[in-house]
Design a protein with these regions (language model features):
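Aromatic-enriched alpha-helical interface/lid elements that frame and gate functional surfaces
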Residues: 111-181, 185, 247
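Active-site-adjacent "lid/gating" segments in soluble enzymes
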Residues: 1-123, 127
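Short coil/turn segments at secondary-structure boundaries
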Residues: 103, 175-180, 210-211, 236
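A glycine-rich dinucleotide-binding beta-alpha-beta segment and adjacent secondary-structure elements
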Residues: 180-227
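A structural signal for well-ordered alpha-helical segments within the folded catalytic domains
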Residues: 47-54, 131-134, 172, 241
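Residue-level signal for nonpolar/aromatic packing positions in well-ordered secondary structure
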Residues: 17, 56, 67, 136, ...
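Short linear loop/turn motifs
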Residues: 147-163, 188-198, 212-216, 252
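Flexible, small-/acidic-enriched active-site or ligand-binding loops
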Residues: 152, 207-252
Length: 252
């Protein structure tokens, strides 16, 4: 696994996640019109690990079937570039934009946008399908917005109207109003809110351990045979002297 792969003019170039996102155009479509943002978590680090896992599994299958090994060249930048397939294959489509703050899914549409509430909190609205948009507009008492969903992008006027609506009430008001409405609405949670979220609890995604140095474990995000992921056991604690003694004994 490397940043830019084992060949090409960048093969010896150093980099980190932000560099790979810049090189692949991700930062061009992420953030506000004024400036890109540095996303967190680091996209290429996790994407590259997943790509490596997929490639390793494929190589293991090939080894089992053909008794032939494989040399795997995984590039973090390549992996992020592959995640840009939608943007890259849509570049020639008339009227489709991925530019920062102006694209269909990068801030240019009112039905797929982040809005601020009266108490300086934020909500996400992703009512891209007409049924979700209609449900949202009806719930907030603005049926006149329904027919405007497909206005040309960027939808500056419509976005401003929806922005004023959300800014008129605190987050609790919008959660009470829209949580039960099928309109793809979700408040932007703070990290401390995630631990107690009922969906996270139901999915057994986190675990508070009883290690000497307690922390919250993020568990495997998959259920297998209807079984929830299980917490990992605490590593065995060993003092430095004990480790050195064991190491010396093994080396002798």
């Amino acid at each position: 696994i490397s940043g830019y792969g084992q060949n090409g003019p960048y093969r010896l170039k150093a980099g980190h996640d932000l560099n790979y996102l810049a090189y692949t155009g991700v930062l061009h479509s992420t953030g506000s019109i004024d400036t890109p943002i540095a996303p967190l978590p680091q996209i290429s680090d996790y994407a590259g690990a997943l790509q490596a896992t997929t490639a390793i599994l494929a190589a293991l299958l090939r080894a089992k079937l053909s008794r032939s090994g494989a040399y795997l060249d995984i590039s973090l930048a390549d992996t992020v570039l592959s995640w840009q397939s939608h943007a890259l294959t849509s570049m020639t489509r008339s009227g489709y934009s991925f530019s920062r703050g102006n694209g269909n899914e990068s801030g240019g549409c009112a039905d797929y946008h982040i809005y601020q509430t009266a108490d300086a909190k934020f909500v996400s609205l992703a009512a891209q399908e007409s049924m979700f948009w209609e449900n949202f507009c009806s719930a907030v008492g603005h049926q006149e917005w329904i027919s405007r969903q497909r206005e040309s992008v960027p939808q500056v006027s419509l976005i401003n109207e929806v922005t004023r609506l959300f800014a008129s009430q605190p987050l609790s008001h919008w959660c009470d109003l829209l949580d039960s409405i099928d309109c793809c609405f979700e408040p932007v949670l703070e990290t401390t809110d995630i631990i107690s979220h009922p969906q996270v609890i139901a999915r057994h995604l986190l675990s508070k351990n009883d290690w000497p140095d307690p922390l919250v474990q993020v568990l495997r995000p998959s259920w297998i045979d209807d079984s929830a992921p299980k917490p990992r056991l605490a590593p065995k604690y060993c003092g430095v002297s004990a480790v050195k003694t064991a190491w010396d004994a093994k080396s002798s």
